[in-house]
Amino acid sequence: EDGKRYEHRDEFFPTLFVKSKKKTKYKTLSGQAVEEIHPGTVRDCRDFYKKYEDIDNFEIYGNDRYIYQYISEKYPQDEVKFDISKIKLVTLDIETTSEQGFPDVESCVEEILAITIQDYTTKQIITWGSKPFKNDRKDVTYNHCPTEYELLTSFINYWMQDVPDVITGWNIQLFDIPYICRRLDRVLGEKLMKRFSPWGLVSEGEVHIMGRTHITYDVGGVTQLDYLDLYKKFTYKAQESYRLDYIAKVELGQQKLDHSEFETFKDFYT
């Protein structure tokens, strides 16, 4: 409002549908007549689903992704015009130790060594790192945090003061976001981990890709746009590898920092 970010809680009463014995203007895809019901708030609707989930032949219809219902009702126009400069979008990337091999989200035993975010609008970069670093760039702010506890504490304190609307980055949905959430929970506790969301709503889930189960985290109030998914969807060309190093070489002619002279990644970062 007036060019300033603000949060507002808007009460919303979703619409659901149930079978109707009378003729109505609403039908399911199979032709079944249905009528509107309004159980109440979003929480009331969820309770309504639970109440009748074990009742035979009692079907509940409608979009149970209530965020989309709200957007559809709030902005009925075909195209929603927006100013991207008013949307706080950041790119996020983390680096971890590799004491026991490549970091794994499920076990999440490797410590976080660095977290970097870049603001899409200002292009400013902020890094929290565990090693001393001599910074001579005006577009970079480096925060030296000797321990992971200090690093995560400093990061989440900053994050809570300026939570972005959108997070992007390469493979963030399957690695960076769930890894940060799990390390925050393990090192600082669940209460501070949930502050990763401006609403305090962080929930764990699973996705199944190519026969493998992956852990994901939904961060309420923050949209995750995984650059890997966007690249696959909008380039219309299959690549032999989707490792960031390979894609950077294909698209930019550049590669990640070479550390082949070291026997292990641990030798490189220590």
Give names to the regions the model predicted.
Residues 1-230, 234-270:
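The two-metal-ion catalytic cores of nucleic-acid processing enzymes
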